[in-house]
Amino acid sequence: MEFEIHLPKEPLLVAVSGGCDSMVLAHLLYEANHDLMIVHVHHGLRKESDEEAEAVRAWAEARRVGIRMTRLEWEGQAPSQAACRTRRYAFFQEVMAETGRRHLVLAHHRDDQLETLLIQLIRGEAGVDGIPRIRSFATGQIHRPLLPYSKQQLYDYAKARQVVWHEDETNAGTKYLRNQMRHRLLPLLAELRPGYEEATVQAAMVRYEQKQEHLKYVTSYVKEQMTDRGLPLEAIQKLPTDFRRLVLRALLPDHDFTSEDYNRFLTLLRVDMPSGEVYYGNWRIQRTYGYVTCVRCPEKNLLPEALEVGIDLGTYHYGEQTITFSRTTTGIPFSAVQFPLTIRSVLPGDRIRLAVGTKKVSRILVDAKVPRASRAEIPVVVDAAGQVLAVIGHRIAIFGSFELLAESCLMIEW
């Protein structure tokens, strides 16, 4: 049979394990004169992997096709399938960045699609729509052009064209859920409902296309409703529940989400909750004062180091803030200040002097509706005695009658 392969006319990175599926994919793309580079990962778990890696290298070199290979080291550990996948895709991403090839091509086929759909179903995942044919990845996209074709069709092609491959013996076992699906459930379904494969894959494709259209609408809606303070909760609540789930996808388009992830997001949106936050990887989605914001979590060691300000004063840069210190006739009396001054982040217990008494800096930031997660990033100016002289962007300390009697004062501007 003839395979219809639709891929960009750009340089491709093709993942090849040495098995039938990926060797057929490489053969098809080579015969179609695509600009290929092979990428191979030796997982370091089976003795046969040495032979497979050498066979992939020989295939590429015989055709003068570029190849990048790596061998994973586990230091005596027995890695899970998820750990192998994470490191495998990390290598793909690394090669894409180094070579500038934006299109990664994988050899998933129709049988893989059926297994994935059933696994999603029995796990109760929110989106039972299988493996996407194209999706964003790293600096480009992942393509799976063999999804319409069955494993048997790939075997038939390999035999007819004398494509050499290596069989991974672990695929014949039933240790993993996917293998149990492959060897026990799929044959039973084929017996009970001949032709179910095409109907199931087609239904999943329709579901996926509908979901993409819905996501396109929600993404556009989110962009239209977004304000400087974030996405208004009221705007999200106007959407149907299924569309509210997709707001999460619109905010974090490069993440994969489970049903539990979506449920945590929907719980965050509940009207009876005044505020809250949920985390997805190194991203934080926060609900504060009627708005939903999505920000990358700052690492503690990324907060700026404290800066010392001497008696000569001048202009200083703390993070993204520019702070100028000068001598004037109004402001904080020099007689009330002990040098050197320090610019640093807010600390628990910080208080600032006002016209009547003092006030916690944390309360000032709450009153100013600064999100909890952003408060540590607000700089304060303190003197050598620990007095808070300014909360940058919000308040200057007030020294009352001392200011009226002072001949020389400190001005802090931002």
Curated annotation (Swiss-Prot):
Name of one Pfam family that matches: TilS_C
What GO CC terms are in its UniProt record? cytoplasm
Which keywords does this chain's UniProt record carry?
Answer: ATP-binding, Cytoplasm, Ligase, Nucleotide-binding, tRNA processing
According to its UniProt record, the EC number is 6.3.4.19
Q: Reaction catalysed?
A: cytidine(34) in tRNA(Ile2) + L-lysine + ATP = lysidine(34) in tRNA(Ile2) + AMP + diphosphate + H(+)
Write down the top EC class of this protein: ligase
* BP GO annotations: tRNA modification
The protein's matches in InterPro entries, at most eight in alphabetical order, are given as:
Lysidine-tRNA-synth_C, Rossmann-like_a/b/a_fold, TilS/TtcA_N, tRNA_Ile_lys_synt, tRNA_Ile_lys_synt_N
Q: Which residues bind ATP?
A: 17-22
Record-linked CDD domains: TilS_N (cd01992)
Q: What is its main location?
A: cytoplasm
> Where, subcellularly, is it found?
Cytoplasm
Q: Which GO terms describe its molecular function?
A: ATP binding; tRNA(Ile)-lysidine synthase activity
- HAMAP family in UniProt: tRNA_Ile_lys_synt
| Family assignment from sequence similarity | Belongs to the tRNA(Ile)-lysidine synthase family.
Please quote what the entry notes about the protein's domains: The N-terminal region contains the highly conserved SGGXDS motif, predicted to be a P-loop motif involved in ATP binding.
**What role is this protein assigned?**
Ligates lysine onto the cytidine present at position 34 of the AUA codon-specific tRNA(Ile) that contains the anticodon CAU, in an ATP-dependent manner. Cytidine is converted to lysidine, thus changing the amino acid specificity of the tRNA from methionine to isoleucine.
Official protein name in the record: tRNA(Ile)-lysidine synthase
The source organism is Exiguobacterium sibiricum (strain DSM 17290 / CCUG 55495 / CIP 109462 / JCM 13490 / 255-15)
